[in-house]
Amino acid sequence: MKLPIAKRIPHPHELHGDVREDDYYWLKDRDNTEVIQYLEEENRYYHEIMRPLQEQTEQIYESMVDRVPDSEMKVPVQHGQFFYYSRLDKNKQYPIYARKQAASRALLQDATEEVVLDLNELAEEDDYLSVTVQRMTTDHSRLAYLENRDGTDRYTIYIKDLNTGELLSDRVPNVYIYGSMEWCRCGDYIFYTTVDEHQRPCQLWRHRLGSDVESDELIFEEKDDTFTLFISKSQSGKFIFVYSSSKTTSEIHMIDTDSPLSPLQLVDERRDGILYDVEHWEDDLLILTNEGALNFQLLRCPLNDLSSKVNVVEYNEERYLQEMYPFRDKLLIAGRENGLTQIWVVHDGELQQISWDEPLYTVAVLSEQSYDTNEVLIQYESLLTPKTTFGLNLQTGEKQCLQVAPVSGEYDRSQFRQEQLWATGRSGVKVPMTAVYLEGALDNGPAPLILYGYGSYGSNSDPRFDPYRLPLLEKGIVFVTAQVRGGSEMGRGWYEDGKMQNKRNTFTDFIAAAKHLIDQNYTSPTKMAARGGSAGGLLVGAVANMAGELFKVIVPAVPFVDVVTTMLDTSIPLTTLEWDEWGDPRKQEDYFYMKSYSPYDNVEAKDYPHMYITTGINDPRVGYFEPAKWVARLRAVKTDNNTLVMKTNMGAGHFGKSGRFNHLKEAAESYAFILDKLGVEAEEKVLNHR
């Protein structure tokens, strides 16, 4: 089959005395039938290339499905007289949300299950389903949930009467994907945020149950197009907090849930560069702020005097404080120290760290727990330890293991190894990596290795257990995650050093990680693949230009690769919100810096690795046209005969197809491609179970 070749239509961009040629700009017009024809031609080519790998794909997929437990159930969380949980049955695509009425956890086994929401039933109507936020009224009689069926960020609120099982007539459209819906205490009103034409959440509304949505009252509007609007309820349920925030500045108002018709109360006005978060505890507000504290400090002030702030604990620059979890009897803080997630209990003005046994792990306080609880649920996992839920007794400080997530099939953790590695980046910066592999995988020299990275928005790539990774580990594949700058694994400064005019650090850190793995004989350029999605797709796309010779395969998923053009186009969803992350190319300094690494603008006439690229036609975060243009230019310019494929999902968005088996199928396809290029047989198995 011949290569798909996109036609070239000259479209120069001129700015700051510079001209950027963009012959594939026309691919942005999804209403143009030639655009759809080109995407479908690329899809046909993709399927032609993947046809010889069908058997390998199926073998990988089946090995992943074999790791799906017969049933999975989350540890029930108590709210009043009910315990709420979700469960996932072996052959189901989606979870089932349920509850049991019981006086204590010990009585749950004999209690009767009531299904609150079965996503499998909802999904029968369409190929795609996403349900994100779910909110229960205080009296447990009504459930509001957000639903989407096209892969965009525009969701609709549905409200279910749990006494009758029927949906109410209330339907609220155009609501943001998350952080966008809360009930007042009485359950007669629901607050929600809607998006503008660019899918930016910017308006807060109040809806009275049973009334026409057209009569809903606009409570607040965020008019600065570099800010977004989110809402969340305090742990105590007393307040709804309304967040106006950019990536560098925040402002918060609050609503008393007992007085839903009362006006908003401002906590602290926005000041450039000052970020803060709030919570309610006892008679005070807790404030987590970066004012005078790069890694954030914890303050408190009386509800009747918000200007009187005092420190809760002394600021420690080695600790990055990120989340507050106030309960009636104790205050827990989540954050980072020494490159790892941590949880502390506030006691007598000090932070007492909860200790764990492994050197590498990820730990988090589960969200949406009852303020009155004496048992806080904490989730723990590592590269080798499945998700484990502990109950922390707030009175004694003791941890009790409540559940270890089931792993289907044989799994002996003693046959695997996890470790932390350090590469030396530019200016001597030490770049952390986490690695997991089969014992003995490195005994015979360089091993096939997949290097993953993200490194943007301060998001972290922490060590987590993945049962679907086990079949690949058993084949001798080494998995490494590079915790590059742009994430916040090493604190807030780690993030600041990987954004804006420091963005190239993200890419050079990743390259340093790859070189370290080669130098230390973990792998070789002929045996290494690079993976990343979204902003991680930008990472591996930039690295393909800067140091593609280090990799045999590069796999960018929904990649952000046309940085300058996108950041100049304010008609694209979320563009204005991103200027504090990447820069504003209307400014000359930002323009030339962004151009220096943008993958699309730096494609050269040289050899590139094998590349497997995915995108979604309805993606609101990274337009399909970015990878489409990139692939078209690569096909026209690159000098090698290596395989380049692009798969466009014609019915989904940024997160691909919905349903867990669909996700596994897509993962199996990409792994089949990677293993084929790395020379690993799909049926090959290094591990012989003892």
UniProtKB/Swiss-Prot annotation:
Alphabetical GO biological process terms: proteolysis
Pfam families found in the cross-reference section: Peptidase_S9, Peptidase_S9_N
Listed GO MF terms: serine-type endopeptidase activity
Family annotation (Gene3D superfamilies): alpha/beta hydrolase, Prolyl oligopeptidase, N-terminal domain
Positions annotated as active site in the UniProt record: 534, 619, 654
The keyword tRNA-binding appears for this protein: no
Keyword tags: Hydrolase, Protease, Serine protease
InterPro entries: AB_hydrolase_fold (IPR029058), Pept_S9_AS (IPR002471), Pept_S9A_N (IPR023302), Peptidase_S9_cat (IPR001375), Peptidase_S9A (IPR002470), Serine_Peptidase_S9A (IPR051543)
E.C. number(s) listed in UniProt: 3.4.21.83
Catalytic reactions on record: Hydrolysis of -Arg-|-Xaa- and -Lys-|-Xaa- bonds in oligopeptides, even when P1' residue is proline
General function of this protein: Cleaves peptide bonds on the C-terminal side of lysyl and argininyl residues.
Family: Belongs to the peptidase S9A family.
Name of the protein this chain belongs to: Protease 2
Organism, scientific name: Moraxella lacunata
Organism phylogeny: Bacteria, Pseudomonadati, Pseudomonadota, Gammaproteobacteria, Moraxellales
